[in-house]
């Protein structure tokens, strides 16, 4: 697990490097599918002092199997998503400014241009609000459930992120670093959408044929973007 702990540590350290977190407002995890174990950031530990050995290993029920700290308070959300989506290898949660602003507004981040379409096939959805019973019950678990409810039958790697109403963004990917990459993109396109709509409030969505081309040339069965 040491290699995975190092990867998760490095991915967590990327959050402040890319300006996605303030103080300790974020967490990254990754899963070892063969062992059924998840490595995640410890709760409330400052990035300035955090080490790879501080990462916490939990099983799929959330029981700590390795580590001296308590795992992130969002662990149950991560675990619920891993259980539902076998294609996920890493998950990240932040309170990055612009993506969180869309979450607080209760709005999906609209697909307005090709930067968005290179990574997200359509709008980045916003969940419904959690009920009082859901919040007072198993809050973090129910956060995972409302993400799954919102995604429905969508392929999660075609929509590698979401904003949770009145809370903030979650992103995911094939591994921890891919998840952070998608979180960075989400923050950037959230900022772009806010600026674009400020310039032109009547702005609608990117043309569907242009969105299809940009997404499929990177992620489709006949993708040709980048190097083999």
UniProtKB/Swiss-Prot annotation:
- Binding-site list for Zn(2+): 74, 93, 95, 167
**Gene Ontology MF term list:** aldehyde-lyase activity; L-ribulose-phosphate 4-epimerase activity; zinc ion binding
CDD domains from the xrefs?
A: Aldolase_II (cd00398)
- Lineage top rank: taxon: Bacteria
Q: What class of enzyme is it?
A: isomerase
Gene Ontology, cellular component aspect: cytosol
Described function: Catalyzes the isomerization of L-ribulose 5-phosphate to D-xylulose 5-phosphate. Is involved in the anaerobic L-ascorbate utilization.
Recorded family membership: Belongs to the aldolase class II family. AraD/FucA subfamily.
Any idea what this protein is called? Answer: L-ribulose-5-phosphate 4-epimerase UlaF
**Induction remark:** Induced by L-ascorbate. Repressed by UlaR.
Species of provenance: Shigella dysenteriae serotype 1 (strain Sd197)
Cofactor note (record): Binds 1 zinc ion per subunit.
Which terms does the UniProt entry file under GO BP?
A: L-ascorbic acid catabolic process; pentose catabolic process
| Key word Isomerase present | yes
Which keywords describe this protein according to UniProt?
Carbohydrate metabolism, Isomerase, Metal-binding, Zinc
Query: Required co-factor?
Result: Zn(2+)
Q: Where does substrate bind?
A: 26-27, 43-44, 72-73
Reactions the enzyme catalyzes: L-ribulose 5-phosphate = D-xylulose 5-phosphate
Named in its record, the pathway it takes part in is: Cofactor degradation; L-ascorbate degradation; D-xylulose 5-phosphate from L-ascorbate: step 4/4
Q: Which gene encodes it?
A: ulaF
């Amino acid at each position: 697990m040491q290699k995975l702990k190092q990867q998760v540590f490095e991915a967590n350290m990327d959050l402040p490097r890319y300006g996605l977190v303030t103080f300790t407002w974020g967490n990254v995890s990754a899963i070892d599918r063969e062992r059924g174990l998840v490595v995640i950031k410890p709760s409330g530990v400052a990035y300035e002092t955090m080490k790879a050995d501080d990462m916490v290993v939990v099983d799929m029920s959330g029981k700590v199997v390795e580590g001296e700290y308590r795992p992130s308070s969002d662990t149950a959300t991560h675990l619920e998503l891993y259980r539902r989506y076998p294609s996920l290898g890493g998950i990240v949660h932040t309170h990055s400014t612009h993506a969180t602003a869309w979450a607080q507004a209760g709005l999906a981040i609209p697909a307005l241009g090709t930067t968005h379409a290179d990574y997200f096939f359509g709008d980045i959805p916003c969940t419904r609000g959690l009920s009082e019973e859901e919040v007072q019950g198993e809050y973090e678990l129910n956060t995972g459930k409302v993400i799954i409810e919102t995604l429905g039958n969508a392929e999660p790697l075609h929509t590698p992120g979401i904003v949770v109403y009145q809370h903030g963004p979650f992103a995911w990917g094939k591994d921890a670093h891919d998840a952070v990459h998608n979180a960075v993109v989400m923050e950037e396109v959230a900022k772009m959408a806010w600026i674009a709509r400020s310039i032109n409030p009547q702005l609608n969505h990117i043309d569907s044929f242009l969105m299809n081309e940009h997404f499929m040339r990177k992620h489709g069965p006949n993708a040709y973007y980048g190097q083999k």
